[in-house]
């Protein structure tokens, strides 16, 4: 991959889940909503039924994202917007990795363009982007209706893997297709983001698993291991399960 010098200002590209905070933000926001309206746990009845369909690849990740979001069924748009605002100032704020937020602030001070690029539904990404001072944000485009339906619509692809790179090019946020971006840092915890890390001159892995760590070793990517409120990846998965049921309490 050729090194581009077209944009000397550079970029700082950040994944969200398990990168800026130690949780899946979809599950953490679900946890917050269920603690406000406990009756919404009824969504678990059909979500659990859908899991075998996902295992059999009858439902893809895009569809499962819609099924999971069914905990919002019947919610008014203004209520959802209020919950997002409250969530960002409470549970989300408590969960942030201070060390990674400091990296965001460093890149801002050094003049790089900050891009939050996540597979999460975009209805809360605008607030996260504003809160943390990003210049741009990209997520999975989930439609917010005046009253939320059982299966919210997703416009476009699930913003994951190479789709993140395509989205940045389509929005003209980056240039030089096929080129490595000079003076640029990319941050992620996931091997799904190897494409994102690979286009940056500097890659930073957050608690990488084996596959990502092996790839990072080839490229000389840096590793960060901020303190997590659980032990290992299985601890993180268990936290997501508890959050999906609305019973997780942040310390």
Please name every model-derived segment:
Residues 2-59:
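Active-site neighborhood of HAD-like aspartate-dependent phosphohydrolases
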Residues 24, 75, 163:
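Conserved active-site and cofactor/substrate-binding residues in soluble primary-metabolism enzymes
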Residues 44-49, 56-63, 238-251:
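Membrane-proximal basic amphipathic "stem/tether" segments
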Residues 15-16, 67, 137, 149:
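Residue-level signal for pocket-adjacent positions within structured domains
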Residues 64-98:
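Metal-dependent phosphoesterase signature
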Residues 2-3, 7, 82, 89-115, ...:
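C-terminal cap/substrate-recognition subdomain and adjoining C-terminal extension
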Residues 50-77, 137, 141-142:
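Short, compositionally biased "basic patch" segments
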């Amino acid at each position: 991959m050729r090194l581009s010098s077209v944009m000397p200002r550079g970029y700082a590209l950040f994944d969200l889940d398990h990168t800026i905070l130690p949780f899946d933000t979809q599950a953490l926001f679900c946890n917050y909503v269920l603690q406000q309206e406990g009756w919404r746990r009824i969504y678990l009845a059909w979500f659990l039924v859908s899991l075998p369909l996902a295992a059999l690849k009858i439902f893809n990740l895009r569809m499962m994202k819609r099924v999971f979001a069914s905990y919002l069924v019947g919610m008014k748009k203004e209520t959802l917007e209020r919950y997002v605002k409250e969530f960002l100032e409470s549970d989300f704020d408590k969960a942030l990795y201070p060390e990674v937020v400091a990296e965001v602030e460093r890149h801002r001070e050094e003049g790089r363009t900050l891009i939050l690029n996540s597979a999460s539904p975009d209805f809360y990404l605008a607030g996260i982007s504003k809160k943390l001072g990003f210049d741009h944000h990209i997520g999975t485009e989930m439609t917010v209706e005046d009253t939320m339906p059982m299966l919210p619509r997703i416009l476009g692809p699930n913003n994951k893997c190479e789709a993140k790179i395509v989205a940045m090019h389509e929005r003209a946020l980056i240039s030089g297709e096929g080129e490595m971006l000079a003076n640029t840092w990319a941050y992620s915890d996931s091997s799904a983001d190897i494409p994102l890390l690979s286009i940056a001159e500097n890659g930073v892995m957050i608690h990488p698993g084996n596959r990502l760590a092996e790839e990072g070793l080839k490229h000389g990517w840096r590793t960060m291991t901020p303190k997590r409120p659980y032990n290992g990846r299985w601890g993180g998965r268990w936290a997501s399960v508890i959050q999906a049921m609305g019973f997780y309490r942040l310390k």
